[in-house]
């Protein structure tokens, strides 16, 4: 009878160690990917939504606050202007002739939707198109500050409280942007206690029907979807 010490073969130990060395990192990566809930880039959006991606805006203001955040200017060729020119061209190619209204939203506040809407609107205005930016982010409006508009009491909330605002009422709540004569702004206006109820009113459809006759494009700065939800 052999009573000596029995040990596994070195080759078996190496194989087990090699297998664990591959399996454990792979398991960790799988779990990280499985439980990841954040959209982190272009590829994630393309994979999850199956929607066409018009462009990537790589650099944006955290919160569009003043005219310094307007990066598109006439007779200038900076990097951001090229980005918005590319977006403009893609949108023009995609839209049909009667499609005039474009909505801008984001997953949460501070992602740059107002920045994008404002600068794209300037880009279209520089083409000679008559453009309106409408502020429907009523809880946290930024258009008035972004374009440094003087009258804080003008805006769409003044219209939504009426069932059928007239053309004169609508025009009275529109201001020129001060950036380009082809670009007008309809700010959010005074913040009401019930913004969700206001934007659900039928009067909003009547406002759009009037504005479609006046403008080539209407850009809507909407609230983030987490606030809507």
Language model features with spans:
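Structured cytosolic domains appended to multi-pass membrane proteins
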Residues: 138, 154, 185-187, 221
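Loop/turn-to-beta-strand initiation segments
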Residues: 128-130, 181-184, 212-220
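Polar/charged helix-initiation
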Residues: 1-5
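Conserved beta-strand segments of the P-loop GTPase G domain that flank and frequently precede/overlap
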Residues: 103-105, 187-188, 218-221
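Short acidic/glycine-enriched loop/turn segments that link adjacent beta-strands
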Residues: 179-182, 228
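Conserved D-loop-proximal element of ABC-family nucleotide-binding domains
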Residues: 194, 228-229
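Short boundary/hinge segments that flank catalytic cores
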Residues: 9, 13-132, 136-156, 161-171, ...
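Conserved Switch II/interswitch segment of TRAFAC-class P-loop GTPases
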Residues: 222-227
């Amino acid at each position: 009878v052999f009573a000596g010490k029995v040990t596994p073969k070195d080759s078996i130990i190496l194989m087990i160690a090699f297998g664990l060395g591959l399996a454990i990192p792979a398991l960790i990566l799988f779990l990280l990917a499985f439980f990841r809930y954040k959209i982190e880039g272009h590829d994630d959006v393309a994979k999850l939504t199956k929607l066409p991606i018009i462009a990537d805006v790589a650099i944006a203001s955290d919160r569009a606050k003043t005219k310094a955040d307007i990066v598109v200017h006439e007779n200038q060729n900076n990097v951001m202007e090229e980005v918005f020119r590319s977006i403009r061209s893609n949108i023009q190619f995609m839209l049909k002739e009667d499609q005039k209204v474009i909505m801008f939203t984001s997953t949460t506040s501070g992602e740059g939707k107002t920045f994008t809407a404002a600068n794209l609107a300037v880009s279209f205005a520089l083409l000679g198109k008559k453009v309106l930016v409408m502020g429907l982010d009523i809880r946290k409006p930024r258009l008035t500050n972004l374009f440094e508009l003087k009258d804080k009491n003008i805006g769409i909330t003044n219209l939504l409280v009426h069932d059928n605002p007239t053309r004169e009422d609508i025009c009275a709540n529109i201001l020129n942007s001060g950036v380009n004569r082809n670009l007008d702004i309809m700010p959010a206006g005074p913040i009401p206690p019930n913004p969700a109820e206001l934007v659900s009113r039928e009067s909003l459809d009547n406002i759009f029907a009037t504005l479609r006759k006046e403008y080539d494009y209407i850009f809507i700065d909407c609230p983030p979807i987490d606030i809507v939800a």
